[in-house]
């Protein structure tokens, strides 16, 4: 669970640390705005990606399933700055098929946490393999 009050306090401290006045009119709402933004950016922290993939259907064929152009936004775990990307997922079903709507949700859950791009791709692959 996100600690919004802790985030707001940290933003106030950050503003002080860079020489800004957090009580300045233009910055008064910044701590709340950052806490609100982080609640979305970090919604995947603690989430279980395999739960997203729980609903499957019998595979009538074992052809490759491909879904392209899944847009994503994540936060670099080294710099806490956003990065964007596009994921393309292809997999061979093993008697069961994942609903196509579940694949973007999987990407969203895994991207919504402090992340590195190279780890994100491995985590998506690992979740699909399980």
Regions picked out by a protein language model, each given a short descriptive name:
Residues 1-130:
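A domain-level signal for the structural core that forms small-molecule/cofactor-binding pockets
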């Amino acid at each position: 669970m996100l600690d919004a009050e802790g985030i707001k306090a940290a933003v106030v401290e950050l503003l002080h640390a860079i020489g800004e006045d957090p009580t300045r009119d233009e910055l008064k709402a910044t701590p709340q705005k950052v806490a609100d933004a982080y609640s979305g950016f970090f919604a995947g922290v603690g989430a279980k990606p395999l739960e997203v993939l729980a609903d499957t259907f019998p595979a009538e064929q074992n052809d490759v399933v491909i879904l392209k152009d899944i847009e994503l936004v994540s936060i670099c775990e080294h710099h806490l700055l956003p990065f964007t990307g596009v994921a393309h997922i292809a997999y061979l079903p093993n008697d069961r098929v994942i609903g196509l709507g579940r694949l973007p949700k999987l990407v969203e859950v895994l991207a919504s946490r402090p992340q590195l791009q190279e780890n994100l791709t491995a985590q998506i692959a690992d979740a699909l393999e399980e």
